[in-house]
Amino acid sequence: MRFNSNIAVITGANQGIGQGVAEKLASEGAHVICLDVKDCKETLHRITSTGGSAETAVMDVTQLSEWKQQVSRILNTHGHIDILANIAGVVAQTADTAVDLEEAEWDRVIGIDLKGVWFGMKTVIPSMIEKRYGRILNIASLAALRGLPNLFSYSAAKGGVTAITRQAATEYASCGITINSIAPGTIDTPILAGITDEMRAEFSAAHAIARLGTPRDVAHMAAYLTSPEAEFITGQTFPCDGGWSTK
């Protein structure tokens, strides 16, 4: 299996895309470390019940001290980190326009969706430099690539993710580290639990493939970009949007 002996750190692994990526990498041999502000017991069960290897820890990605603590623990236990997947993310819980958005909500979205990605790279990259190997995957969004309504803070954060992905990839390419991001369309995760059937149909129709994406759709792309085979790909943001960006 292509990830045998790999240690993969995945944030936002409690549910949705993070859970899907954790399951996929574990199914191909990685030992997956699932990090989330919520408990990841379900993800752990899904992985270990099918023969995979995983562990979990509760961590707030917006706290640099917690990143340092977890990375130190992981390196002391396993000796190396091969893959970092920064997947934890949120959308605003209030109106998300330039006029109506509250400052506290801006800070929350930017903190989790952008600063959390930076903190992950900041704390993990040094060990990858030492090993001269690393694969980093960040989750951006279609909202980073085109204007979508009521996503002011979210699009700012995800646009920032594409920028720091490109910048960090340039800085660390000579160290054997690749850094890429995926820009999903609308993915059927618990974040959509409260939408109406009408909204679900509207989101589905926006994709050329005419359905919502699934965490598995993103996980397949994530697995390739974090694999040894993707050694000549870095600094890129890849849409995984069912053709939405072509319309």
Predicted regions and their residues:
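Residue(s) in the substrate-gating loop at a strand-loop-helix junction
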Residues: 141
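Active-site helix of classical SDR
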Residues: 121, 157, 165
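Conserved glycine-rich Rossmann-like NAD(P)H-binding loop of the short-chain dehydrogenase/reductase
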Residues: 28-42
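Conserved glycine-rich cofactor-binding loop
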Residues: 14-15
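Catalytic Tyr-X3-Lys loop
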Residues: 99-118, 133-137, 161, 209
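Short C-terminal tail/terminal secondary-structure segment
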Residues: 95, 146, 206, 223, ...
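Alpha-helical segment proximal to the catalytic Tyr-Lys
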Residues: 126, 170-174, 231
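Substrate-binding pocket helix/loop in short-chain dehydrogenase/reductase
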Residues: 94-98, 102-110, 192, 199, ...
